[in-house]
């Protein structure tokens, strides 16, 4: 098996001086390909290993590649945009399987977000809406994550705190974060409420 680029060309094996030196010192073994999320010298969990290149008995890296079935692509590899703030970063990590859900929930509770609102003249309560079969209260982590148009003609956005979401969102409803982006995250209102309790 040889990994492919986005346009289906074979990906060449690593050819850096460090990779060649590792291969020279470790003939007959494997050279791990690591997700770029992890820096040099960091401890890498199993899910951060893309796979491994075979090193032959002469200490040369071959074109043979063994894929790691447990690999999880990081936000960068998935093409997520650069996080606009700490909550955005936490959401991206959770969606990619790199972050703890509980930490993102706690951060949402302590953050101010933008909430989709109904047309002018409607009450200012949290609005439960449906888009593409997904129902919930739609919130956005920052101005950078807002859609170009309101979710409903005449609608807009307003700021809300995570604690307001926890206290006002009805049971059985999801808080849907950044629905228009690649890192979409859903949190049940009951879970947010439970996390807000002292």
What kind of region is each of these model predictions?
Residues 1-198:
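An interfacial alpha-helical scaffold signature
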